[in-house]
Amino acid sequence: MTSGSKAHPVPATCTMESPPLHLDMGAARSSVCTELTIMPRPLAKSLQDSIDSNFPIDEGFQSGGEDEDMRRLFCNILPEVSTAAVDAPFHYTSSLPSKGVRDKLIGGLNIWVGASPKALDSVTSVVVDVHNLSLMQDDVEDNSPLRRSRPSTHSIFGIDQTVNSSTCGIVEVLRRSSEMQNPAFLKIVIEELRSLLIGQSLDLLWTHQISTPSVEEYLQMVDGKTGGLFRMASKLMIAQSESSNMNPTDLDALMTLLGRYFQIRDDYMNLTSQEYTKSKGFCEDLDEGKYSLIMIHALENCDHKSRVLLDSMLLERRATGAAGLGHKELILSMMQQTGSLQYAVEILSVLFNEIFELVELIDRRTGKVNKPIRDLLAALEIKKDSPRK
């Protein structure tokens, strides 16, 4: 180091054998040689103070110049950036028209649970947000063009930004959950989020591998993918209620059966409902190559020639990324021939009756007749030989 240079004493020095690095900051500032240092700093001391103490301005440095502006830009702590970009996809999804089924379900469950309005708001907020975030991911994974009759989120913001936004949204849900006074809140959210993602992974696996699951495997997938969100709602409500004498097991069973009913109903409506065609496109599940209960039944009950046709069309769908209109119409006619659509209606009827019996059981145990839940079930019921809606 030359005699004209200032020596900067540095504790805990890590010296490199190579020549020191010279930073030319312009003619107004002399060359400065620094050694690579690793130095602990008190947490209370600002980063700017640390920079100033380790790298003092040379005597030849003139304040107000271009170099000082550069130093302020690169060495100062900057304000936090706007979250507008990461929030926009989620806000768009949340703004899409919805029938509010989950809001109605939570409101109905509270007839039994008796959570406070504040607790109810916190549960509804988390459950609805998780639902919308899962829709964003579902549409990316299924390459769905429409969601609730509007362009899907990733078709507007792109896949990368949509995935990033949904991931950030999950982190935000976990942050809010961790700030609740009840420690069980976060545990429940994590537990059922995990169930949801594991269930979704099975759905994706079967589609990717073109592998037909058993009915039992299908139900296990649904219990995670769809039932997880319903159980999250009921468990959070009980955890937030100070006066509930509810048996959690009763509600767990009800929510799991409701999840199965919702998923099978959704699969059926996707193939038969004009309203669903307008909202998501004609038989969109066939574009996805989805192994719904109806598809599983058709594959297991068709003759050999039809099975070869179905398997071949599923292979072709994976190659092209979608099913053609003619393919969809052919698959639909084969499902009708095997009685698969009617089979789904019969299963829905069995589930509906079981759900209604559970509702009556909980009514008796709580001493409260739950009309909102009954009204919701009546609105969702699909009766045998129901016409195309």
From Swiss-Prot:
Cofactor(s) needed: Mg(2+)
Catalyzed chemical reaction(s): isopentenyl diphosphate + (2E)-geranyl diphosphate = (2E,6E)-farnesyl diphosphate + diphosphate; isopentenyl diphosphate + (2E,6E)-farnesyl diphosphate = (2E,6E,10E)-geranylgeranyl diphosphate + diphosphate
EC nos: 2.5.1.29, 2.5.1.10
Assigned GO CC terms: cytoplasm
Binding annotation for Mg(2+) 2: D138, D142
Keywords, ordered alphabetically: Cytoplasm, Isoprene biosynthesis, Magnesium, Metal-binding, Transferase
Binding-site positions, Mg(2+) 1: D138, D142
Location(s) in or outside the cell: Cytoplasm
InterPro entries: Isoprenoid_synthase_dom_sf (IPR008949), Polyprenyl_synt (IPR000092), Polyprenyl_synt_CS (IPR033749)
GO molecular function: (2E,6E)-farnesyl diphosphate synthase activity; geranylgeranyl diphosphate synthase activity; metal ion binding
Any Pfam family matching the protein: polyprenyl_synt
Binding site residues for isopentenyl diphosphate: K99, R102, H131, R148
Cofactor info, note text: Binds 2 Mg(2+) ions per subunit.
UniProt key word Signal: no
Example of a GO biological process term: alcohol biosynthetic process
Functional pathway: Isoprenoid biosynthesis; farnesyl diphosphate biosynthesis; farnesyl diphosphate from geranyl diphosphate and isopentenyl diphosphate: step 1/1; Isoprenoid biosynthesis; geranylgeranyl diphosphate biosynthesis; geranylgeranyl diphosphate from farnesyl diphosphate and isopentenyl diphosphate: step 1/1
Annotated dimethylallyl diphosphate binding sites: R147
Annotated function: Catalyzes the trans-addition of the 2 molecules of isopentenyl diphosphate (IPP) onto geranyl diphosphate (GDP) to form geranylgeranyl pyrophosphate (GGDP). Does not catalyze the conversion of dimethylallyl diphosphate (DMAPP).
Family: Belongs to the FPP/GGPP synthase family.
Name of the molecule in the record: Geranylgeranyl pyrophosphate synthase A
Source organism: Phomopsis amygdali (Fusicoccum amygdali)
